Amino acid sequence: MADTKYSQYVIRKPIDYGDKIYYDVGYYGPNVWYKGEDYKNDFTMIFIRVEESMIMEEYAHVHDFDMYLWLLPLEPNNMEDLGCEVELVFGSGDEKEKHILTKTGSFFVPKGIVHGPFTFRNVTKPVLLAHACTGAADYYKTEVFK
């Protein structure tokens, strides 16, 4: 499409299917990342199709930005049942709390809050992880414990 007055506000990115994309641990399924440079601001949005059980983030870590994690089943006739268990640990030491979602839901992680591991268990159908960072032109983390 030719450049027009508003074409700068339309962003097209291909899905990255990769052979198997290994980051810290485990396979992150087909995904697309929209970074601050795409929007010319400090907002990052990542969409990942999770297809198998894995530890997505193995270690506790923090961010200096707010993070939102939405989990949605990719089954059009049942938008409530995730078809898996998704666990996120908040806090560290004696303050650790494990929280588990088995239905459509979201985790909000304010900046500075220690969190992780982030685990997908018993995955029986694909799940969409929508991952947003506000105040961050890209996703990054500072590990707290290994």
Question: What residues fall within each predicted segment?
Answer:
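Conserved metal-binding segment of the jelly-roll/cupin
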Residues: 98-121
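A short, N-terminal "cap"/entry segment at the start of jelly-roll beta-barrel domains
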Residues: 1-60
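Short, solvent-exposed aromatic-acidic interface loops
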Residues: 88-94, 108, 133-135
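A short beta-strand-loop-beta hairpin characteristic of the jelly-roll/cupin
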Residues: 71-102, 140-143
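Double-stranded beta-helix
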Residues: 1-14, 118-146
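Short basic alpha-helical hairpin corresponding to helix-turn-helix/winged-helix-like nucleic-acid-binding
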Residues: 54-57, 61-73
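Conserved hydrophobic/aromatic beta-strand scaffold that supports enzyme active sites
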Residues: 47, 69, 106-108
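Extracellular structured ligand-interaction cores
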Residues: 65-69, 83-85, 114, 126-127
